[in-house]
Amino acid sequence: MFRDHEFPLSSGAFSILTSESAVLNDDFDDVFGSEPGSPAFDVRDGHDGDTFGGGNTEISDIPRLKEKHETEGYRDGVTKGKAESVQKGFDEGYGLGAVLGLRIGKVIGILEGIFGAVSVSAAKSEDTKWTDERSRLEELFKSAKEELKTEKVFAREWWGEDGIWKFEVPGEKEGKDVVFPDVAAAHPLLKKWEGLVEEEIQRWSLDLEFMEGNEEEAVPAKQQIKADAVEQKMGTVKTDLNW
């Protein structure tokens, strides 16, 4: 009777061992990864709560690569956009800046020329009137150089962040075509100093048209040769213009 009950017990133990070894053999499938179509699940350990990825773990690189490409693409786009914007702004602002620079240079140059001529006369004359004029023109010349600096001409007071002027340009509200010389002439600082220079021109009876163009074209060749011969004969030396 004892042996009759022993065989079922052995049979049951054998069955349990077979089932257990079958479960252990399935663990080796993860070495090579799951099939492409199989889903991946997270298995949590009941002791410490750690998470282990099941199935093919290579798919976790896709979000990282996607984020990397998006970041690099954004940077490339910003870099290219900046380059195009800077070039476009330079192309649009160069013409206006050149016109402003020429007119400001003319103002500074005329004042410097008048101041230099008066300084020569003041040094040679004992009349205090020339000394007073030299002091006045010196202050005027210094003020012009200070107020017509680049950072002041292009200050936020006169220009917006988009590069558009804030001051009123004649004819703009009427819908007329406004060109760069019109904008430059309407600039408050340049308008002020061009007016002051015009007063000095009238004060000293200057003829600016005489200084324009080529002097060789204004004086015939025969007269130029004759004038040079007279200078050599008299031994004269050319000096600065003295008013």
UniProtKB/Swiss-Prot annotation:
Keywords: Cytoplasm, Nucleus. Belongs to the YAE1 family. May form a complex with LTO1. Residues 73-113 are annotated as: deca-GX3 motif. It is found in: Cytoplasm; Nucleus. This is Protein yae1. Residues 36-60 are annotated as: Disordered. InterPro entries: Essential_protein_Yae1_N, Yae1-like. It comes from the Eukaryota. GO terms for cellular component: cytoplasm; nucleus.
